[in-house]
């Protein structure tokens, strides 16, 4: 994939999790993982994993590193806030809207009232110190249509979409706009955190495990990557790119943000997730409302599969690593032997792939072990989330399946608890391990219920189909 030239002064930094092989001859990492060989000239241009663009050659190398997802951008500057219009879709949330508007001082704002029972009036924002235009739908057409209405009235080069239940934190706009000095970038999203102090168990869980919070690590937004989409509760887009792909799909009532991200990627645009920028969201913390919302998110998988075949697969895994864990799950001597043989074969294939650069056996072993562990976590997650109805039936009928499901539920919950604990702020009381596992299981059951509901409604099994690669 190629793109427009990056400007001089633009820099990239190799991700610290990327493995440097053969004394700098190759980089192994990214999302999805790949091996990127570097010519001697390219090796010499990298200093401490950093590269600054100063000519056409360095610009091309920087683009290659970014597109290989092994490096992150360090832009020099970006557009001004004067180049941005904020679009706020709202329906029957006057208090949230006023709370948001108070944080948008000095910005141009278009409020799209999507059929509120009490219409939003321009006079509602007197004294807010921002330029506000109010548009109204006489009846609700959905958030996607409301965003498109706002987009059609924008004249600036960039448009920010903020839902009425969010509040951006100081410095959010500058941190996001910097990425647009790359002319290929069409969309940038902040990290979404909780708005209120966590005052119950669900709120404390959401503070570390919200579906909207994509974590503390910056990332490109690509299908099957660590960040495969970003929620439209808070995003900034290049208006021309958004208009070119037709804006939001108004026929979708869930997952329209995922659909937009993937259509932009398919058009050749680049998308970024920038967790330095923070936007607070008023999470649902009532257990019933929380469960229903998680299920609602799940219903989008099947319609997305129809529009983007292969991009919603619950499992993307090598056939040989899948064989390792399936044979291990058999639990017999033959199963253990077959699992060991499959692991050796998988390791041999990895060693052969890495043979293009000088690598030590220890490095090959580390890469192979990482691949096996990653596939194990994928399997545990898929069993408990996407395939839980099948897993429960199997657990009732077969003892070995029961043991496998129990192990998957515990491993997935423990690993999730360990990796997500760092997402909470200092004022939030941590959720205990057992409580986290229970809520994670409810989270997955809710999403899986919505997923299967969508599959039945669409009569399409694509959202359940794994991708097994050779």
UniProtKB/Swiss-Prot annotation:
Root EC class: transferase
Entry keywords, A to Z: Cell membrane, Glycosyltransferase, Membrane, Transferase, Transmembrane, Transmembrane helix
Location(s), subcellular: Cell membrane
GO cellular-component term (any): plasma membrane
Location, primary (coarse class): membrane
GO molecular function terms listed in the Swiss-Prot or TrEMBL record: glycosyltransferase activity
EC numbers: 2.4.1.-
Membrane topology classification: Single-pass membrane protein
Domain of life of the organism encoding this protein: Bacteria
Disruption outcome: Cells lacking this gene lose the ability to utilize ethanol as the sole growth substrate. Glycosylated mycofactocins are not detected in this mutant, as well as PMFT and PMFTH(2).
Pfam families reported for this sequence: Glycos_transf_2 (PF00535)
Keyword hit for RNA-binding: no
Transmembrane annotation, as ranges: 315-335
Similarity comment: Belongs to the glycosyltransferase 2 family.
Known role: Involved in the biosynthesis of the enzyme cofactor mycofactocin (MFT). Acts as a glycosyltransferase that catalyzes the oligoglycosylation of pre-mycofactocin (PMFT), adding up to nine beta-1,4-linked glucose residues. Is required for the in vivo ethanol assimilation in M.smegmatis.
NCBIfam families assigned to the protein according to its UniProt record, in alphabetical order: mycofact_glyco
Protein name listed in UniProt: Pre-mycofactocin glycosyltransferase
Organism: Mycolicibacterium smegmatis (strain ATCC 700084 / mc(2)155)
């Amino acid at each position: 994939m190629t793109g427009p030239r990056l400007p001089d002064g633009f820099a990239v930094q190799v991700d610290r999790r990327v493995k440097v092989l053969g004394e700098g001859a190759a980089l192994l990492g990214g999302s999805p993982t790949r091996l990127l060989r570097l010519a001697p000239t390219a090796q010499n241009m990298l200093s401490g994993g950093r590269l600054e663009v100063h000519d056409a050659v360095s610009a091309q190398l920087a683009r290659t590193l970014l597109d290989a997802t092994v490096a992150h951008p360090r832009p020099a500057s970006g557009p001004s806030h004067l180049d941005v219009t904020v679009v706020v879709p709202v329906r029957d949330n006057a208090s949230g809207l006023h709370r948001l508007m108070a944080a948008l001082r000095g910005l141009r704002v278009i409020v799209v009232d999507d059929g509120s029972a009490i219409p939003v009036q321009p006079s509602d924002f007197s004294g807010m110190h921002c330029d506000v235009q109010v548009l109204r739908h006489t009846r609700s057409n959905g958030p996607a249509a409301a965003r498109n209405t706002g987009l059609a009235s924008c004249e600036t080069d960039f448009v920010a979409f903020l839902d009425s239940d969010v509040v951006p934190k100081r410095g959010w706009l500058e941190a996001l706009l910097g990425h647009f000095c790359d002319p290929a970038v069409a969309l940038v999203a902040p990290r979404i955190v909780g708005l209120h102090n966590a005052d119950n168990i669900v709120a404390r869980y959401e503070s570390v495990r919200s579906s909207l919070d994509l974590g503390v690590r910056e990332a490109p937004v690509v299908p099957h990557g660590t960040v495969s989409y970003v929620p439209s509760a808070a995003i900034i887009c290049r208006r021309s790119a958004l208009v070119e792909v037709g804006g939001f799909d108004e026929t979708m009532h869930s997952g329209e943000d995922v659909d937009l991200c993937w259509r932009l990627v398919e058009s050749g645009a680049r998308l970024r997730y920038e967790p330095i920028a923070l936007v607070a969201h008023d999470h649902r913390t009532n257990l019933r409302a929380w469960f229903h919302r998680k299920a609602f998110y799940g219903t989008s998988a099947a319609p997305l599969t129809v529009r983007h075949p292969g991009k919603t697969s619950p499992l993307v895994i090598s056939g040989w690593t899948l064989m390792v864990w399936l044979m291990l799950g058999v639990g017999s001597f033959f199963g253990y032997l077959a699992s060991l043989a499959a692991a050796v074969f998988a390791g041999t294939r990895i060693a052969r792939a890495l043979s293009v650069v000088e690598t030590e056996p220890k490095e090959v072993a580390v890469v192979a072990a990482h691949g096996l562990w990653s596939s194990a976590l994928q399997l545990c997650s898929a069993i408990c989330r996407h395939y839980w109805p099948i897993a429960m039936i199997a657990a009732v009928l077969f003892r070995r399946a029961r043991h496998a499901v129990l192990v998957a539920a515990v491993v997935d919950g423990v690993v999730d608890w360990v990796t997500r604990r760092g997402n909470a702020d200092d004022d939030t009381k941590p959720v205990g391990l057992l409580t986290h596992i229970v809520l994670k299981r409810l989270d997955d059951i809710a999403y899986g219920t919505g997923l299967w509901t969508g599959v039945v409604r669409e009569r399409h099994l694509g959202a359940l189909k794994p991708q097994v690669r050779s």
